[in-house]
Amino acid sequence: MSQEFSRARRVGELLQRELARLFQEELKDPRVKLVTVSHVRVSPDLRQAKAYVTFLGKEEDTQEQLAVLNKAAGFLQHGLSQRVELRVIPRLQFVYDDSIERGRRLSALIDKAVQKETDGESDNSTE
């Protein structure tokens, strides 16, 4: 059983690398700019893959860019079939990866809490 999961992980890493190359070399849609593939999760049967992506640019454009990628999934699957030797290329689904934004918010909250604590200590030391 664990062998299936390690194979799925290896296939996911391979798809991540090849999708990144496809975005650089093949995808010419002007609505999609600077796509980063964070990671790819492949189902244990290797039939479906979720590609987690981020975009550089305005946050408002994220949903439109995701829609464009999901519409181009067939084109990208065909491109993968030309580059990767797998019996079946997984069906692609693109999902926005908000982990970077979430990390940024958490970091800001931590910085704010540390600043409050530092301000509180400096107020107590002056008394």
Swiss-Prot record:
Disulfide bonds: none annotated. InterPro entries: KH_dom-like_a/b, RbfA, RbfA_dom_sf, Ribosome-bd_factorA_CS. Coiled coil: none annotated. It is found in: Cytoplasm. Transmembrane segments: none annotated. Pfam families: RBFA. GO terms for cellular component: cytosol. GO terms for biological process: maturation of SSU-rRNA. Keywords: Cytoplasm, Ribosome biogenesis. One of its GO terms (molecular function) is ribosomal small subunit binding. The keyword Membrane does not apply. The keyword Amino-acid biosynthesis does not apply. Monomer. Binds 30S ribosomal subunits, but not 50S ribosomal subunits or 70S ribosomes. HAMAP family: RbfA (MF_00003). NCBIfam families: rbfA (TIGR00082). One of several proteins that assist in the late maturation steps of the functional core of the 30S ribosomal subunit. Associates with free 30S ribosomal subunits (but not with 30S subunits that are part of 70S ribosomes or polysomes). Required for efficient processing of 16S rRNA. May interact with the 5'-terminal helix region of 16S rRNA. Belongs to the RbfA family. This is Ribosome-binding factor A.
